[in-house]
Amino acid sequence: MVPVDLELQRVLVERMDVATTRTQPKSLSLPNILTYARIAAIPVVIGCIYAQSILDYPLWLRWVAVAVFIAAGVTDYLDGYYARIWNQQSAFGRMLDPIADKLLVASCLLMLAADGIIHGWSLWAAMVILCREILVSGLREYLAALRVSVPVTRLAKWKTTIQLVAIGFLLAGEAGDMVVPVVTQIGLLLLWASAIFTMYTGYDYFRAGIHHLIKEDEG
C-alpha cells in the first residue's frame, strides 16, 4: 500500500505536469527547441568550413564543424522521439522539422561545392538532392492545401541518414584524409548513394502526389 504522503506527492507532480503542458506554448516544447538548435547549428558549421577553406584557418575547425553537424543530426532523431513519447507533437513542429533538415543539408552541400570538396561529376549528385528537396517541398505544400498528408516512408528516413553521414565525411575533408586517406572518397560515394535513394523516394512522393492531383481534378 502506498503511503499517503507519497501518494499526495505523486498527485501534485501529475497536476503540475498537466498545468505546465497547458500553459507552455507548443512552440517552446523540447522537441521544437531541439529543432531550433538544429537551425542554429547551420551558421556555425558553415562558418567553420568557410574560415578553414576560404580564410585558411587551421584544419581543426573542420573537426569543430563535424562535431556540431553530428550534434545537429542527433537532434533530428531526438525531436521526433521526444515528441512521440511525451505527446508533444504539433502542427508547427511537423512544419518546421523537415524545413530544418533541408536547410542543414542544402547549406552544407552548397558550402562543400564552394570549398571544392564536391566537384566534377559529384556536383550532379548534389544537384539531384537539392532539386528533389525543392520539388518535394512544393508538392507537400500543394497537397497540404488540399488537406492531404504525405507520410515520410522508412526508405526516406534511410535516405536522410545516408545524406547526413555523407556530409559528415565530406565536412571532415582534408582533416579527415590526414587520419584515414579515403575519408573524402567515402563521403563522395555515400553522396552518390544518397542521390540514388533521393531519386527513388522522390518518385514515390510524386506518384502519390499525382494520384491525389488526378482525384482532385476528377472530383
Indicate residue ranges for each PLM-predicted region.
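Alpha-helical transmembrane bundles and membrane-interface segments of multipass inner-membrane proteins
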Residues: 2-219
